[in-house]
A protein has these predicted regions:
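Hydrophobic residue at the +6 position relative to the catalytic HRD Asp in the kinase catalytic loop
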Residues: 196-198
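Glycine/Thr-rich phosphate-binding loops of Rossmann-like dinucleotide-binding domains
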Residues: 51-52, 109, 204
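Active-site nucleotide/adenylate-binding loops and adjacent lid/helix of ATP-dependent enzymes
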Residues: 4-5, 56-59, 63-138, 144, ...
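Short glycine-rich anion-binding loops that position phosphate/pyrophosphate groups of nucleotides
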Residues: 47-49, 104-106, 213
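Conserved N-proximal alpha/beta basic substrate-recognition cap immediately N-terminal to
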Residues: 6-91
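Generic C-terminal helix-cap and adjacent flexible tail
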Residues: 236-241
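PAS/PAS-like sensory domains
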Residues: 191-194
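ATP-dependent carboxylate/phosphate-activation module, predominantly the ATP-grasp catalytic core
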Residues: 116-117, 121-189, 200, 205-207, ...
């Protein structure tokens, strides 16, 4: 079986290490988001659920599923989904100040702002109550709904703790309650390889977002886990290769 690995050209350039790991471990070729040819399986590393949907409609196995990508890339829908399933989030449609303003489909913390004034709600943004512990969050990596590792990210200079924005990162030992919460969230959505991000409020984890094209830089920098290798092993197992 031969598959395709889909990245936009810009993201393929930015993620050369990950691309190399995929190509090294699987019989696949790298293509961009315009590819509409044949494949036995697809690894979708774009944030566009329609790409996954296109191949799914042809009966082709896609990692991750389109419905997961659709949910992960619409923060408003994702928060509403979590609330429906009794997963704690920070309140949305928040009218107080300060307020966190997030682009619905934003990534990497680059379109997240802390406002100290009120404004009319803009389309394509989520307005959310800030947590009581800014500049600190937790990312958990899962493969096939199994927890692989967790890393705590902190920033002393910014309410955003993203590693790519200069925050620090250290491995984190999950407690039993945290593991239970993560497993509950993982059980709500079909997924293959994701990150789940949490913020801290009142001393406990609060759901923040799902990353369907989760990066691996922190895992390789801070642990000895070959997470892309593990993901490739999972793909082989799923395809019975």
């Amino acid at each position: 079986m031969s598959g395709i690995l889909i990245y936009t050209k810009a993201e393929a350039e930015r993620n050369q290490f990950a691309v190399h790991k995929f190509l090294q471990n699987l019989d696949i070729k790298l293509v961009d988001e315009t590819y509409m040819g044949n494949a036995d399986f697809v690894i979708n590393r774009t944030n566009d659920y329609k790409i996954a949907q296109y191949f799914e409609e042809q009966g082709i196995r896609v990692f991750n599923p389109s419905e997961l990508s659709r949910l992960a890339n619409d923060k408003q829908k994702c928060y509403e989904f979590m609330m429906e399933h009794n997963i704690e989030i920070m309140p949305i449609n928040y009218t107080g100040i300060p307020v966190v303003k997030k682009k619905i489909d934003g990534h990497g913390g680059t379109e997240v702002m802390m406002l100290n004034h009120t404004e009319a709600f803009e389309d394509n943004y989520v307005y959310q109550k800030p947590c009581d512990t800014p500049g600190k969050d937790l990312r958990v990596w899962l493969i096939g709904r199994k927890i692989i590792t967790a890393i705590l990210r902190e920033s002393k200079t910014d309410f955003r703790s993203n590693f790519c924005l200069g925050g620090s990162a250290i491995p984190y030992q999950l407690n039993d309650n945290e593991i239970c919460l993560i497993k509950k969230i993982a059980g709500l959505v079909e997924s293959d390889y994701i990150g789940i991000d949490f913020i801290f409020n009142n001393g406990r984890l609060v759901f923040n977002e799902i990353e369907d094209t989760v990066g691996a830089r922190m895992v390789y920098d801070k642990t000895d886990i070959d997470i892309i290798g593990l993901y490739c092993d999972y793909i082989k197992s799923e395809l019975e290769l």
